[in-house]
Amino acid sequence: MLNIKKLLIASYTGCLLFMSSQVEATDIVSVNIHGNSAEAIIELPGGVSADITLEFENAVGLTAQNLGISAEVVDITSQALLQRLPSITDIAPSAAFPMMITIEPQLTSGFSFSGLATVDIHTHNLEYTAGTPLRFFKAPLNGEFKDITMTMGAGSYRARGSTGRFSQFIIVADLRPQVTVIDSKYNDLQTALNNFSADIDPAVYSALLQDLADVNQLMLLQNYSAASNKLNTFNRRISDNSGDKVPNVWRSSRDISNVAGELMAYANTLRFSLRLAN
C-alpha cells in the first residue's frame, strides 16, 4: 500500500509540474547580442525578473535564436527540483526568486564557443548582504545542480559564474558548512580532471594532477590563500595549453568536450569558496 501511495504522489507531482510548465510561459523581453556577449532581460509572472549576461572568449554563430535561452517560474517545494540539489536539508531554492533559466542551443544551430563562458545574473527580487548564503547554481539539462559562484555583489543581488557548456541556472540559499562546500568542489574538480584524462596531453595532465595534489595538501593545512594561488597556476597551465593539448571548444552538436572551459570553471568556484574560508 505504501509503494502505491508513493507512486500516486509522484504521479500527482508530475502532473502539477507539467501543468505549471504550460501555464507559466516564458517571456524573454529582449535578447541583445554584442560581439562575443549576449544579454537577456527576463520578466516572469509575479514580478520575478532578472537580467543575465553571457561573455565568451570567442563565439561563432552567436544569435538570439541560436542561444536557445528560456526561463520559468518553478515550484520551490517540488521534490523533482529538490532532489537535483546536493543537499535537501541545507540547500533551498530562493522563495523570493523562483526562476530557473535554461540555455540549451539546438543541435543543428551551428553555434560554438571556445574557452570559458562567464555568466552574470542580476535581480532586484533579492538583496545582497554581507555573509549572504545565496549562491548561483547550474546543472546539465534535468541533472544535478552544483555551485558555480565566482563572485557576488550588491546592486540588489548580483552573482557571476563560469562554465564550459550550457546548462540550467537557479539561485539558492546554501547553508552547508564552508569546509563541506570546499571538499565537495575539490572532489568535483579532481573527478572532472580524471574523467578528461584521455583528452589531455599526457605531460600536461601529469602537471595538472600535481597542481591539484598541491592544492589538496594546502587545504589540509588550512592554508586557503596559498591553495587559491595554486588554483591560479592550475588555470594558467590550462589556458597556456588550450587547443591541441587541452580541448577548448563547445559546439551545439555536442560531439566534443570543452575540457579547458569545464576544468577552469570548477577551479574558479573552488577558489571563490577558499576565499570565503580564508
Task: Report residues per predicted region.
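Proteolytic processing hotspots in large secreted/extracellular or virion-associated proteins
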Residues: 31, 35-37, 79-134, 202-204, ...
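Predominantly extracellular/luminal regions of secreted and cell-surface proteins
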Residues: 43-85
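Sec/Tat signal peptide C-region and signal peptidase I cleavage site
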Residues: 19-25
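Bacterial N-terminal signal peptides that target proteins for export
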Residues: 2-11
